[in-house]
């Protein structure tokens, strides 16, 4: 029989280790250590789980490469497993599962497809009851977005993450009751050869590219949400997975549509108000008169929800000045500036287990409105009369 891992009983208490640091209480409390340029994260117990969202807070400004501001990169079910004097960050694999009540069948699936252990977080403090304080650097200063691979695939050069030129971005590193937000500036340095034409045209010095990467941690949603199968006649985003608990005559491939949760205060009353309406916040960086037009366009959804019997289920507002648009609690309509015209993209971050949308992200390219205006003006004869 193997012995359990040895734990260091001399580990400092959490209070002693974080004395004098900027503390944020919340879902996963955190402390920012400015001297060591690191984030210390409190894990409440062994095998604690959370939703983990990854986004780019700032962009490269190039449509062909695609590393854009507010790009939602990934949504994971994360688990923090203690192993000796460290905590392992494990990403659970929800692409393969079993709906069968047979627990052994579910176990066979779980043991057939691996999770991903992506970071080891040293324990630096510990309190009675299993609460530990970890140095989250291995999680924070990680190329979650695959910047290096994207630049290489785009033939822009071989870039590597330069830890000595990367730092915690403290203004947007905070914790709240329902979420913990961690922001970091990551610098990617040219490791050899010449930089590509695109980055050479955009960067003041193409041998170094600094982007901000944002991590959001939230509690797993409760079981009150009911997944809905994606109708193939509807072109929309979905959670796709293989369900090995399906009957022999059924397909393993399952698709659940991504959608927001809407619940009435009184579920038995079809006229009862909506408990938590969907609110989309419009980026204040959108210039007028475009911002007013965007708000008017988004507000068309109000009538659609009302006509569906969901009165008051949808609102649109300006993003408050004090709010970071990367904050996972806010659905946002973001303004993207690029060096050339590019795509406007609708996306979301949600629960990989069910398809429930937690944060909607609509990204508008700033060139498109100019292009549309020029097309309209040309058709109306404005170009010839100017």
Which residues are covered by each model-predicted region?
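Auxiliary tRNA-acceptor-end handling modules of aminoacyl-tRNA synthetases
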Residues: 2-286, 304, 308, 313, ...
């Amino acid at each position: 029989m193997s012995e359990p891992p040895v734990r260091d009983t001399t580990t400092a208490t959490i209070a002693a280790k974080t004395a004098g640091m900027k503390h944020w209480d919340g879902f996963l409390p955190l402390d920012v250590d400015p001297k060591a340029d690191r984030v210390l994260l409190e894990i409440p117990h062994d095998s604690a789980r959370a939703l983990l969202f990854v986004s780019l807070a700032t962009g490269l400004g190039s449509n062909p490469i695609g590393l854009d501001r507010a790009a939602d990169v990934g949504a994971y079910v994360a688990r923090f497993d203690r192993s000796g004097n460290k905590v392992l960050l494990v990403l659970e694999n929800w692409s393969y599962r079993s709906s069968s009540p047979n627990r052994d069948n579910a176990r066979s699936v779980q043991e057939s497809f691996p999770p991903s252990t992506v970071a080891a977080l040293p324990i630096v403090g510990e309190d009675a009851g299993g609460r530990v304080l970890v140095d989250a650097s291995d999680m924070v200063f990680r190329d979650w977005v695959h910047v290096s691979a994207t630049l290489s695939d785009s033939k822009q050069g071989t870039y590597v993450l330069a830890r000595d030129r990367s730092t915690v971005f403290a203004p947007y590193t905070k914790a709240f009751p329902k979420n913990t937000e961690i922001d970091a500036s990551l610098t990617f340095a040219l490791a050899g050869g010449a930089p590509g034409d695109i980055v050479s045209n955009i960067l003041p010095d193409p041998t170094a590219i600094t982007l901000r990467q944002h991590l959001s941690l939230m509690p797993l949603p409760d079981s009150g949400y009911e997944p809905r199968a994606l109708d193939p006649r509807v072109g929309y985003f979905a959670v796709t997975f293989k369900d090995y608990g399906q009957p022999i005559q059924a397909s393993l491939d399952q698709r659940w549509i991504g959608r927001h949760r809407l619940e009435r205060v009184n579920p038995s009353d079809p006229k009862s108000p909506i408990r938590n309406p969907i609110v989309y916040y419009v980026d204040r960086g959108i210039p007028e008169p475009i911002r007013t037009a965007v708000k008017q366009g988004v507000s068309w959804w109000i009538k659609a929800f009302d006509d569906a019997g969901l009165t008051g289920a949808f609102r649109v507002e300006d993003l408050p000045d004090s709010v970071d648009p990367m904050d996972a609690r806010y659905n946002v309509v973001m303004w993207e500036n690029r060096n050339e015209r590019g795509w406007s993209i609708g996306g979301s971050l949600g629960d990989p287990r069910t398809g429930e949308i937690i944060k909607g992200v609509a990204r508008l390219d700033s060139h498109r409105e100019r292009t549309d205006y020029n097309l309209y003006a040309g058709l109306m004869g404005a170009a010839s009369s100017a």
